[in-house]
Amino acid sequence: VTKDALAVTIVYSGGDDVFLVGAWDHILEAAMRIQEDFQTYTCHTLHLSAGILLKNAKYPIRRSASEAAELEAFAKSHDGKNAVTIFEASAQQTYPWQIFQDKVINEKQNLLERFFANQEDAERGKAFLYRLLDLLRNSEQRINLARFAYLLARLEPKKNNPSYAMYAEFSKQMYQWYRNPTDRQQLITAIYIYVYQTRMKGDTDRA
């Protein structure tokens, strides 16, 4: 099966290290392809660690490489090492590859994409997600669960609306994920990824 070409450049490849630069959403796809192909090639006997960093296109390459290496080092410190650290060097943004792909990308980001696919007001959608992010990051405040539920309720269409079934699935999952610490952190990461990937054309972020 031929895979779509990606806007990614190999800056350095040697030994057991590789440094890629490219369109940030393509970097995510490239990282997952490399991980999958490497696991297939080695029959799952070897592991990869990765750091994924988002910077403006004018950010110095040397500094990007250094900071990405810090994220990679953090991923290597994860139990089993077979992990990826994204955005910042923290345990909250470090995931085993399978969890990252299955739970963050295929589950949570996918739901965000499906729900917002038919939303006409993109900027309003982003503002809504930023409000959700604030509540997710401050979940230790008990009142924020009620605020989270209220925000979801404000999106509810009439039950005879064709979009109601999608809303019901979205709101149920979001509420459940908020209440589970592991799912909550994965949702935070998924929202970050979704927001970056839906920025207006003309933005010049790279990874």
Functional labels for PLM-detected ranges:
Residues V1-A207:
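Charged, helix-rich terminal subdomains or tails
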